[in-house]
Amino acid sequence: MGQKVNPVGLRLGINRNWTSRWFPSARTAPSNIDEDNKIRKFLKKELYYAGVSEIVIERAAKKLRVTVVAARPGLIIGKKGVDIEKVKEGLKTLIKKEVSINIKEVKRPQADAQLAAENVATQLEKRVAFRRAMKKVMQAALKSGAKGIKVCVSGRLAGAEIARTEWYMEGRVPLHTLRAKIDYGFAEAMTVYGIIGVKVWIFKGEVLQKGIQFEKKEEAKEEREPRRSRRGRQ
């Protein structure tokens, strides 16, 4: 089951939180969901250059607060906050409501699954070989402290006539372990041959009562090369 479902949805309420946080009535729920979708699409499009990892939307009474987690927050804020004010005005025009925006920085961008997936997708659009793009992202994540990473690409790879799926994995990615801190990201590459889907899973450690505890026993053993595996399917 852990291999099939979204790893974030599987761990909601355990070690992951919702990205839309509000309690609506049955009457307002559809409009709130549609509004959240519009906000996310707008911010993803307008702030693509800043490396947006996550967008959290919170509602309380008539207040709406949006938290943008990005790799380059300085580009969003701009000089003296000019750029962030433009984004606020754009959101206000879109949803006809006052919005407060908070900006947070991603601590380790190379170990963020969403940013890694978008990185691979961008390289594929620039016609970089898919294997090279995947391995480059995997090496960067492991150097940033990730315990394991799995990258999967699907579509007409290298312009092949028949679409297929290929994936690489290094280290451990325990998808069935609910206490495992698994970060998941998805992106699409718009190539001349069609759309290529990119999925990334990154294992950051196990979440216990005192936070994330990394595997000390494994680190104490003699150093050995991380496990590598690859699979292609037509």
UniProtKB/Swiss-Prot annotation:
Gene3D superfamilies cross-referenced by the UniProt entry: 3.30.300.20, Ribosomal protein S3, C-terminal domain (3.30.1140.32)
GO BP terms: translation
The task this protein performs is described as: Binds the lower part of the 30S subunit head. Binds mRNA in the 70S ribosome, positioning it for translation.
In its keyword annotation, does this UniProt entry include Cell membrane?
no
State the organism named in the record.
Helicobacter pylori (strain P12)
Gene Ontology cellular component terms for the protein in this record = cytosolic small ribosomal subunit
Give one Pfam family.
Answer: KH_2
**Name of this protein:** Small ribosomal subunit protein uS3
Annotated SMART domains: KH (SM00322)
The residues covered by the KH type-2 domain are 39-107
The family line of this record is: Belongs to the universal ribosomal protein uS3 family.
Stretch forming the signal peptide: none
Keyword set for this entry?
Ribonucleoprotein, Ribosomal protein, RNA-binding, rRNA-binding
UniProt subunit comment: Part of the 30S ribosomal subunit. Forms a tight complex with proteins S10 and S14.
Query: Which GO terms label this protein's molecular function in UniProt?
Result: mRNA binding; rRNA binding; structural constituent of ribosome
